[in-house]
Amino acid sequence: WENNDGAYGALYDAAHVGWRFPVQLLREPQSDVRDMAFSFYGPTCDDADHMAGPFLLPADTAAGDYIEIGMLGAYGCAMRTGFNGFGNGDTHVVTDEPMASLYMEETEATLSSNVVKL
């Protein structure tokens, strides 16, 4: 999803529950600068539109860079509101390997003994 979002949308859980979604900077060439902790602020004028993080990104991350925020899923999109006129933007679906797979070891798929194949 391409989205400039915040606490009143797909990043609700990051703001109000404190979830730290996995993030990565999308830039070519890749940055080789050391990571630092960032907080995110949403597009509204509301002080609750703040995601404390920390979200680790290269220290040279700047305005205008694209940041992929993983594991938002369908619920994040469904929770979007029109607060302060936001939330009605275009949605662009971009697919790749799920970010969660970056943190998993390669395993061989096996069929569990308690699974019935229909």
Question: What are these model-predicted stretches?
Answer:
Residues 1-118:
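Charged (often Lys/Glu-rich) extended helix/loop segments that serve as interaction or gating elements
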